[in-house]
Amino acid sequence: LFEKGIVKAMCLHVSHDCNLACRYCFASGGNFNMKKEVMSFETAKKAIDFIINNSGNKVHLEVDFFGGEPLLNFDVVKKTVEYAKEEAKKYGKIFRFTLTTNCVLLNDEIIDYLNKEMYNVVLSIDGRKEINDFTRPTANGKGSYDLIIENIKKVAKSRDELGLDYYIRGTYTKHNLDFYKDVEHFYDLGLRQLSVESVVADEKEDYAITKEDLPEIMESYDKLTDIYLERLGTDKEFRFF
């Protein structure tokens, strides 16, 4: 039930900037049609104070580091996590942290940190190389698949081994209505926790999904269901959100 005035979860936009230029980006390239900037630690501290002060008797609190690309402001992410943990001890709270990333800046140091501090990590990739490179180019127009795929595999493997949550987050558009093939592609790469969702866009955009696309979309979901059920209970099982 809704409790008036109670806040137990927060999406913290630590970066209004991004190093990709995804065609369908709801944030207009990460800056939400505003000046490119990153959140200061002082603002992040105020956000943590706010959620603690407004959480009532809730013990378990959640913060999702988001953007833009949050790893462009990684130092503030780390400082905010430490501050939240310190404050949580004072007030008898427990924080769970999630970070959503386009995976470009991931390296061994960052991956180790995420495995230590993040309850969940959301890894953005849209599917097969030709699909991802079309929908998620870099700022200079080049494809991003080759920049991120090894990073994604490394994160997934390490978190699988540690029993930690992650999931692959893909977006399908008019250009890949056969998105069940992208889910199969993820599986073939060793990825087991998967999600794909439809783009939300104005119908005038060439990638927008329209009513006429629904039969093909339903066919893809039917095929995806068959694939899922075939592998359920076997060593080829995967989770789909």
Where are these regions (language model features)?
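Conserved alpha-helical substructure of the radical SAM core
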Residues: 1-112, 116-117
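Aromatic/hydrophobic pocket-lining residues that form the small-molecule binding cavity
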Residues: 40, 44, 77, 148, ...
